[in-house]
Curated annotation (Swiss-Prot):
Keywords from the named record: Cytoplasm, Elongation factor, GTP-binding, Nucleotide-binding, Protein biosynthesis
NCBIfam families: EF-G, PRK12740.1-5, small_GTP
Domain tr-type G: 11-287
GO terms for cellular component: cytoplasm
Organism: Mycobacterium leprae (strain TN)
Keyword rRNA processing: no
Name this protein carries in UniProt: Elongation factor G
Gene: fusA
Amino acid sequence: MAQKDVLTDLTKVRNIGIMAHIDAGKTTTTERILYYTGISYKIGEVHDGAATMDWMEQEQERGITITSAATTCFWNDNQINIIDTPGHVDFTVEVERSLRVLDGAVAVFDGKEGVEPQSEQVWRQADKYEVPRICFVNKMDKIGADFYFSVRTMQERLGANVIPIQLPVGSEGDFEGVVDLVEMKAKVWSTEAKLGEKYDVVGIPTDLQEKAEEYRTNLLETVAETDEALLEKYFSGEELTVAEIKGAIRKLTISSEAYPVLCGSAFKNKGVQPMLDAVIDYLPSPLDVPAAIGHVPGKEDEEIVRKPSTDEPLSALAFKVATHPFFGKLTYVRVYSGKVDSGSQVINATKGKKERLGKLFQMHSNKENPVETASAGHIYAVIGLKDTTTGDTLADPNNQIVLESMTFPDPVIEVAIEPKTKSDQEKLSLSIQKLAEEDPTFKVHLDSETGQTVIGGMGELHLDILVDRMRREFKVEANVGKPQVAYKETIRRVVETVEYTHKKQTGGSGQFAKVIIKLEPFSGENGATYEFENKVTGGRIPREYIPSVEAGARDAMQYGVLAGYPLVNLKVTLLDGAYHDVDSSEIAFKIAGSQVLKKAAAQAQPVILEPIMAVEVTTPEDYMGDVIGDLHSRRGQIQAMKERAGTRVVRAHVPLSEMFGYVGDLRSKTQGRANYSMVFNSYSEVPANVSKEIIAKATGE
């Protein structure tokens, strides 16, 4: 095993992801890959599925998905690191972060359904990061499975240039194997072969010969066009060698000009080994992908390039943080350049903090395999990093670099959460800290008015899952409020002078303060939302009381005059006032400052602001009218419409309050074929009729 810890020859390494729609059979495919790649050093341990079973049991026992972040396995002296990608809309964060560290991917499709909405969305995200892919049409043994239909949906729905390099032998219950169009041989799994470990290479069945010739001709024409010499050879009637064909397919795949398509049935153990061969033959090694680009810490315009070599200085990206039952915090990193030993000190260049690497592991299908050194091109799990979170760069302290991070949007939806008992309060704090480390899109703050803890996330499902994890993993008993939109208030008019006198006369010394202010709308630079200016002359208000007036005004801004939402974008100018030698005090001026601001704001035409989301809907042309009509009914403003690879993309600005439950409505309107993403865009004034409703709700009228 020792020589297999880390392969130093990077041409033999593949960092891949397996991406799929929820039910396309991703887990089974991953499981079978681990099973076959494990055979080489597990012979005798495998009793009809024992390997698969113990692997799942261990998952249940430990409560973590071992496949979740990165699993290392070996195939014909090559090393494959598999990074798992989830298949759900609200977890785009998970998908984005795994795609960021992949070099290539296997897209798994359901042989009966072809391209499904989720596969469409994950495919588009992979386009964004330009990840080379091969396609595996799975479940060929299913009733209704149709390889040719699946290939057609890839062309039509994904607009992808796909090239079948295999055809199925038999279908549904009679699915036996595949025709390899590169070698022009059939690979057939007989029912006797234990768990599909062996297959026979035979001649192509007569009923498939004509079809195989037709598809082979298409393949050869595509391949020949990649290279002048091949083109000449092909048209002069010479046979292209297997090595030449594979080399050309590899070139097309790595440049994302084409996507090879294979087929099989992971569940029935057919077609998995040729798919592993294709991963090695066609997907890029760390040396085939562009060098990592970053910048000098604090100077974003000074670019640095790091090649995937152990001779370069260290650069690594943390792409996931997970909690392990025995080791505590595990940070998964992709090393882009250089090498580093366990126990070394490195710098978190993103945060400017020193970190010490504790133990280093490579996750081998079902056990942690400790390694001494982490080197370029590989993926590791690290213990002992304290300040490092998702998206941070670890670098050599003497040669710092910040790699391009992943961008995570701010939360747009919030719920208040209230622990039931004192001990739950402590558990809640711990769970929030742990979840925030793992998930960069999960945010928390304390509502000063109600004293409640408010958590924010990317969508309703996202928050449901987070709350569920608090209950299950951290045993927090808590009451959870309804999702809320974060409104704000501001003013539209200048009020030249407003005065307020605070007087209180009880026995002994009283309280006295008089202030006069001007209030006006304000839009500061760099997002400043407030300004205070003092124009009092001649000591009409002693200097020591001025800060109290400002403090009072700022307090009053926490709760607006219409519905109690925070006031933003205003400028307060203190013009004049009066004081009393005996009765004036800091507290008197603070109260006066607070009251005068409320009085002025009420006269300055106050309005409510709401968060507006930039929404992007990707939909097939047939549903375009329904989608646009629906966005209009949600007070949406259409910004742009574009065509992208056979689908339509609609961009619109829509108030967040109108987007609750949108995912369900969109699915039912488009039979699940459209999907959407939304990010916060800006705050904007609420129309009068909506404003009335918000005020009525807030004031309980």
